[in-house]
């Protein structure tokens, strides 16, 4: 009789939740069920109540997310007087020994019901209740990941700040007035040692092929060396002059004489000195003819073993000297 009632109960209510079945097994001790003559009636009432509760749980889970703590709270609120309440409730095979004989005929149906409930829960999106230990592990991993992320961000900001501070320090060193003054003095001394004028430096800057930098005037180089340029112009001109100075010193050490680094023009010719015998011969020719022709100048230069241009310049200078002497004698 009792077995038939149980079978009718399971067939009428296929959506019974496994936790309700386990709760009923734990909360009702086996001796009371075996010794009670109304056990079939009691079990039928309990089955109907459990079926309503299971239907309510399933219908509620379709519209709301499944909350494990609510189910655990409901189960813990039921007063359990059996000493075997420590047995896991959710496991269908963990039945008490006293219940084995009573529920032996329900094992096949119970497995089918569990499969049906599991499939219905998976369709509704709830699935099996998550394990609290798994949830705790996932939450812990999430917090660790967020912690590493925040730590990386916190480490990134000081790094950015340190790079910014490093660039600021470099700019401060370059814009230091004392550093600019020391470089200007050093540049002046080394330029003089190389034998290059300020005008030569200004014109040679165009040969460096630096983008945006052309030749500069002699006054600009002079004002740089005397620190009379504006502070911003001093900062802008310093790397250009430093690049020129490095190349000029390298060329000076190698002694290969790069003319474009200095002026690009010919060096000043040395003053020609004429020996006394050649000088007396030129004076004699000048007394005869102060304005010789080009052919006569070439013949004199060949005779005295001098350059034609030297002879021509000497005659020109001698005429200018005679004019000055006549002018001073009249006045």
UniProtKB/Swiss-Prot annotation:
GO molecular function list: DNA-binding transcription factor activity, RNA polymerase II-specific; RNA polymerase II cis-regulatory region sequence-specific DNA binding; sequence-specific DNA binding
Q: Which InterPro entries match?
A: HD (IPR001356), Homeobox_CS (IPR017970), Homeodomain-like_sf (IPR009057), Lambda_DNA-bd_dom_sf (IPR010982), POU (IPR013847), POU_dom (IPR000327), POU_domain_TF (IPR050255)
Name the DNA-binding stretches. Answer: 267-326
Membrane-crossing ranges are none
Question: Where is this protein chiefly located?
Answer: nucleus
Q: Where is this region: Disordered?
A: 81-108
This protein's UniProt keywords: Activator, Cytoplasm, Differentiation, DNA-binding, Homeobox, Nucleus, Transcription, Transcription regulation
List, for all copies, the residue spans of the domain called POU-specific: 172-249
Which Pfam family, any one of them, does this sequence belong to? Answer: Homeodomain
The annotated subunit structure for this chain is: Interaction with ISL1.
Q: What does this protein do?
A: Acts as a transcriptional activator. Acts by binding to sequences related to the consensus octamer motif 5'-ATGCAAAT-3' in the regulatory regions of its target genes. May play a role in specifying terminally differentiated neuronal phenotypes.
| Protein name as catalogued | POU domain, class 4, transcription factor 3
Hey, which family's this protein in?
Answer: Belongs to the POU transcription factor family. Class-4 subfamily.
Which tissues is this protein detected in according to the database? Expressed in the nervous system. Expressed in the otic vesicle during embryogenesis. Expressed in the adult retina in a subset of retinal ganglion cells (RGCs), and at a lower level in the adult tectum. Not expressed in the adult olfactory bulb.
Q: Which GO terms describe its cellular component?
A: cytoplasm; nucleus
